[in-house]
UniProtKB/Swiss-Prot annotation:
PROSITE patterns: ZF_SWIM. The keyword Phosphoprotein does not apply. Coiled coil: none annotated. It comes from the Eukaryota. Residues 69-161 form the FAR1 domain. GO terms for molecular function: zinc ion binding. GO terms for biological process: regulation of DNA-templated transcription. InterPro entries: FAR1_DNA_bnd_dom (IPR004330), FHY3/FAR1 (IPR031052), MULE_transposase_dom (IPR018289), Znf_PMZ (IPR006564), Znf_SWIM (IPR007527). Residues 292-388 form the MULE domain. Pfam families: FAR1, MULE, SWIM. Keywords: Metal-binding, Zinc, Zinc-finger. Belongs to the FHY3/FAR1 family. This is Putative protein FAR1-RELATED SEQUENCE 10.
């Protein structure tokens, strides 16, 4: 059996982060996964016949293949299989007779026994069954058709039930998607029996219910072994040549675009290991919205043996923007460290405030080493998607009960409460020695809600943003059938996003006012349509909350139906500072419904300026680096000036006194700049 190439060189990463190289996770969202209903359906090619009656002499078919499909479908439902026997042809008509017979028709001819001490005796399934269907070709007025000339449905053996007939060789098929998965697992060192068990687990079927048996998998792997070896040698050579082509493309792009940056590493044999690149628009976007970064490592290339890492940011309209790409030779801490170092260097030394990733111990260590002052957050959705692969087989029927306990665990109010509940949970389900449970516990500070609530993540943990990243990546990898196209596809996506960003405010209309509150109208004139819609939703929900002012100053806010816990809000009218125990503003940069409710109760008609973050405003701080003739300044002066103005604006907006002082000093500074003679012009007008 020949090795079939993969449909796409980029596939979802399935290696489990637990450290066991033989452990894989099931991808529940993988579209190629065959559902249980598909497994239970007929594994032969889809038949056009919904209802099949017993064939009869004189029945007419357009082609002999159509007749074979009809008879095969009839046999499948009747409890046997068929095979093609004799065919007869002539010079004028070609093949004019076809004989289809029961799989147990005829008798095996005696074979010469091998010259071995204990020859293997194999009992033949053929028993002289008379089940058959003979076809004859007839041509009438130049049109040929086939009719049944003989038919017998008399069998001298027992017909099989449906759960047995599916195991006949004629109906045992390994589909293309399963072939690819089997080869991946075999290459990773999985024995055949474990491959079968893993496929049963992934497809959610009971043991023995796959459309093929262990013997078929063993034969398939054996047949493909030589092809796999040849394919590995070919792909090694192809990876080297494609990598060099990618570097040449990067070099050419850097010559055409001075803002494009790239870098690579080589091994001791001077062969390229890792490659990274970023576009000028990405670097400029990071200077505005580089506070939160998502590092996605969902895709890897099996043929190339490379991991694709993509850095994303989120702009003031809630859109994902590509910041940079890396191709890594492996998933080690060393490779991730180089990726992070290179990314920070591309972004001119600026570290993000928060970085969000999948759960991975190597990546966790690299972030702790290279970004010690950056908050590391693991997507909860990524953890939840792995729970079934980690624990469903171990816990069996108790898995759903475990999931309920885990969900309750995530609602722990503090770390001490989590520690107590965690010990009870793992002890109750016997998971104390489990490596996946140990992985979760070791990374708890990065995914536990009560631990990450104070980390600023903008709106990157929303389902809408995650869907936009998935869609972005799918567009890139679907069109990237080689490394060079990966560079081109990512460039197209960055260019399209940058073009859209220039028009996004005129294109997006603001939601109409819903509460008629002065605060709502005030925010509408400051925030982008996206940020305003998020804040507006909190305003609408705030009217459902009751407020009780305590004697010592704080406010207790709770839902009128007490559907959730109470929140403590502290309001300082002198400094116009407000804080809520839910930490929503610290988490997303948008005031929560609890604080908005307190502001309303205290007759505040405007939201304090410091609670309109620069990143969510209509006009983000941006100093143009191009003159009217389109000529870029091109040095680090503009970037330095940009950073200074951004810092100045951030610090000035903290209080009214600071803002007044900054305005006064800036007016004097502008006058001085205007009166300074331009000794060295940065560009010619």
């Amino acid at each position: 059996m020949a090795l079939k190439p993969l449909n796409n060189i980029w596939i979802r990463r399935q290696q489990c982060p637990c450290g066991d190289w033989k452990c894989y996770i099931r991808l529940e969202e993988d579209e190629s996964t065959i559902t249980k209903s598909e497994i239970e359906s007929t594994p032969t090619p889809t038949s056009q016949y919904d209802t099949v009656f017993t064939p009869y002499v004189g029945q007419i078919f357009t082609t002999d293949d159509e007749a074979f499909e009809y008879y095969s479908t009839f046999a499948r439902k009747s409890g046997f299989s068929i095979r093609k026997a004799r065919s007869t042809e002539s010079q004028n008509l070609g093949v004019y007779r076809r004989d289809f017979v029961c799989y147990r028709s005829g008798f095996n001819q005696p074979r010469k026994k091998a010259n071995v001490e204990h020859p293997r005796e194999r009992k033949s399934v053929r028993c002289g069954c008379d089940g058959k269907l003979y076809l004859t070709k007839e041509v009438v007025d130049g049109v040929s058709h086939w009719y049944v000339s003989q038919f017998s449905n008399v069998h001298n053996h027992e017909l099989l039930e449906d759960d047995q007939v599916r195991l006949l060789p004629a109906y045992r098929k390994i589909q293309q998607s399963d072939q690819e998965r089997i080869l991946l697992l075999s290459k990773a060192g999985f024995p055949v029996n474990r491959i079968v068990k893993l496929l049963e687990l992934e497809k959610g079927v009971v043991s023995g219910q796959l459309p093929f048996i262990e013997k078929d998998v063993r034969n398939f792997v054996r047949a493909c072994k030589k092809s796999v070896q040849e394919n590995d040698a070919f792909m090694t050579e192809k990876r080297e040549s494609d990598t060099l082509e990618l570097l040449e493309c990067c070099k050419g792009l850097a010559e055409r675009d001075m803002d494009f940056v790239y870098d690579c590493t080589s091994d001791e044999n001077q062969k390229v290991e890792n490659i990274a690149w970023a576009y000028g628009d990405s670097v400029r976007g990071y200077s505005l919205f580089g506070d939160v970064v998502v590092f996605d490592t969902s895709y890897r290339s099996v043929p190339y043996g490379l991991l694709l890492g993509v850095f994303f940011g989120i702009d003031n309209n809630g859109k994902a923007m590509l910041l940079g790409c890396v191709l890594l030779q492996d998933e080690s801490c060393r490779s991730f460290t180089w990726a992070l170092q290179t990314f920070v260097r591309f972004m001119r030394g600026r570290h993000p405030q928060t970085i969000l990733t999948d759960i991975d111990t190597g990546l966790k260590d690299a972030i702790g080493r290279e970004m010690p002052n950056t908050n590391h957050v693991v997507f909860m959705s990524h953890i939840v998607s792995k729970l079934a692969s980690w624990f469903s087989q171990t816990l069996g029927s108790h898995y759903e009960e475990f999931r309920a306990g885990f969900d309750m665990l995530c609602r722990a109010g503090n770390v001490d409460e989590f520690e107590q509940q965690w010990d009870l949970l793992v002890t109750r389900f016997g998971l104390v020695p489990d490596r996946h449970a140990a992985l979760l516990y070791s990374c708890r500070a990065s995914w536990l809600p009560c631990c990450i609530r104070e980390h600023f993540v903008a709106q990157t943990m929303t389902s809408e943003f995650n869907l936009s990243i998935d869609s972005f990546l799918k567009r890139v990898v679907d069109g990237a059938t080689c490394m060079q196209l990966l560079l081109e596809e990512s460039a197209l996506q960055v260019s399209a996003a940058a073009s859209l960003a220039k028009q996004i405010l005129p294109r997006f209309t603001y939601p109409s006012l819903k509460t008629c509150m002065p605060m709502e109208d005030h925010a509408r004139g400051i925030l982008t349509p996206y940020a305003f819609s998020v804040l507006q939703n909190e305003m609408v929900l705030s009217v459902q909350y009751a407020v009780a002012e305590m004697a010592n100053g704080p406010f207790i806010v709770h839902h009128y139906k007490k559907m959730e816990g109470e929140c403590c809000v502290i309001w300082n009218p002198e400094n116009e500072e407000i804080q809520c125990s839910c930490k929503e503003f610290e988490h997303s940069g948008i005031l929560c419904r609890h604080t908005l409710r307190v502001l309303t109760v205290k007759n505040c008609f405007h939201i304090p300026e410091q609670y309109f973050l620069l990143r969510w405003r209509q006009e983000s701080p941006h100093v143009a680096t191009e003159n009217q003739n389109g000529q870029g300044i091109g040095d680090d002066s503009a970037q330095t000036f940009h950073s200074l103005t951004e810092t100045l604006l951030t610090e000035s907006m903290i209080s009214k006194d600071r803002l007044d002082y900054a305005n006064q000093e800036l007016s004097l500074l502008i006058d001085r700049v205007r009166n300074t003679a331009p000794a060295n012009c940065l560009y010619q007008p």
